[in-house]
């Protein structure tokens, strides 16, 4: 009887967590779809973005900047789009739109937060010997890289495997 109640609880928990994640993913999907005017530019088929693209980029930066990280982290492939990383990183500069630093995409913060600290638009000057405290966005000759890596697991998946492991023991 305990095992059956545990399975019922686990099933309900998984359903609730999955629906929450789908909701968050669909809001980003909608935000990314709204940026369809940028497709020619970020896929490398155009050398400059059009005004409609820049307007949409500005809207997404204001409403859900964390969704932009999905494009940089390979989210475009989920929509069947091959994103040119160099073009995508150059889009804010080409549109003259301030964005959060790309470094925020690899942290738990997603990319949210204030857009006023974008190094592309407001570089900080530092005194001699202090060094720069800015992170360049979309600059450099080579492809974007990261010194760190992360593996993303969904909480429901971890909970499921934990519950299955627990039930297998007892």
From Swiss-Prot:
* GO terms for biological process, alphabetical: defense response to fungus; lipid transport; pathogen-associated molecular pattern receptor signaling pathway; response to molecule of bacterial origin; response to molecule of oomycetes origin; response to nematode
Q: In which tissues is it expressed?
A: Expressed in seedlings, preferentially in the endodermis of hypocotyls and roots, as well as in anthers, sepals and flower tori.
Q: In the record, what lineage is assigned to the organism producing the protein?
A: Eukaryota, Viridiplantae, Streptophyta, Embryophyta, Tracheophyta
Q: What Pfam families does the database record attribute to this sequence?
A: LTP_2
Give the induction annotation.
Answer: Induced by Phytophthora parasitica-derived necrosis and ethylene-inducing peptide (NLPPp) and microbe-associated molecular patterns (e.g. flg22).
- Disulphide bridges, residue numbers: 28-69, 38-53, 54-95, 67-105
Which positions carry the signal peptide feature in this UniProt record? 1-24
Q: Does this entry carry the keyword Cell membrane?
A: yes
Functional note: Lipid transfer protein involved in seed and ovule maturation and development, probably by regulating the fatty acids homeostasis during suberin and sporopollenin biosynthesis or deposition. Contributes to pre-invasive defense against some non-host powdery mildew pathogens by preventing the penetration of the epidermal cell wall by the fungal agents (e.g. Blumeria graminis f. sp. hordei (Bgh)).
Q: Where is the lipid attached (GPI-anchor amidated serine)?
A: 146
User: Which positions correspond to the propeptide?
Assistant: 147-170
Q: What is the species of this protein?
A: Arabidopsis thaliana
Any single GO CC term annotated in Swiss-Prot or TrEMBL for this entry: cytosol
Protein family membership = Belongs to the plant LTP family.
Q: Which InterPro entries does UniProt cross-reference here?
A: Bifun_inhib/LTP/seed_sf, Bifunc_inhib/LTP/seed_store, LTSS, Plant_nsLTP
Q: Does the keyword Signal apply?
A: yes
What's the protein here called?
A: Non-specific lipid transfer protein GPI-anchored 5
**Recorded name of the encoding gene:** LTPG5
Keyword set for this entry?
Cell membrane, Disulfide bond, Glycoprotein, GPI-anchor, Lipoprotein, Membrane, Plant defense, Signal
Q: Where in the cell is it found?
A: Cell membrane
């Amino acid at each position: 009887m305990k095992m059956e109640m545990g399975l019922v609880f686990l099933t309900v928990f998984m359903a609730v967590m999955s629906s929450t994640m789908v909701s968050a993913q669909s809001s980003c999907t909608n935000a990314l779809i709204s940026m369809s005017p940028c497709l020619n530019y970020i896929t490398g088929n155009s050398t400059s973005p059009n005004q409609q693209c820049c307007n949409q980029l500005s809207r997404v930066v204001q409403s859900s900047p964390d969704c932009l990280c999905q494009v940089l982290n390979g989210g475009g492939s989920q929509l069947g789009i091959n994103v040119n990383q160099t073009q995508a990183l150059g889009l804010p500069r080409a549109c003259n739109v301030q964005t959060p630093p790309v470094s925020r995409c690899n942290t738990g913060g997603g990319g949210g937060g204030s857009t006023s600290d974008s190094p592309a638009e407001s570089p900080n000057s530092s005194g001699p010997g202090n060094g720069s405290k800015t992170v360049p966005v979309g600059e450099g000759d080579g492809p974007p890289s990261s010194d760190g890596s992360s593996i993303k697991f969904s909480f429901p998946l971890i909970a499921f495997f934990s519950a299955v492991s627990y039930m297998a023991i007892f």
